[in-house]
Amino acid sequence: RPSLGIIVRRGQGENGGLVVEEVDPDSACHRQGIQPQDIIVAANGQQVQTFADLERIKRTLDVGDSLLLEVLRGGEHLEFTVTLMDQDDF
């Protein structure tokens, strides 16, 4: 099953999205520079407000596929392309 190697919670306020709580040090997200407190607002161009939104997008992909994450960090809009890994690799 594809995994990003992060733990998230639902964001608050006008930006919403998903707040990254933890990033597995062995994950592609970590290698690409995603950090705790980053806010994921979109994945592959689709708005992300809930964990279910992110899971729905991930279900269309396989291990080894790329996922474009749009992230807010300190008011700055960033984009990261991460490769989905098998959740058993963590």
Report each predicted region and the residues it spans.
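C-terminal recognition in membrane/secretory proteostasis and scaffolding
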Residues: 1-90
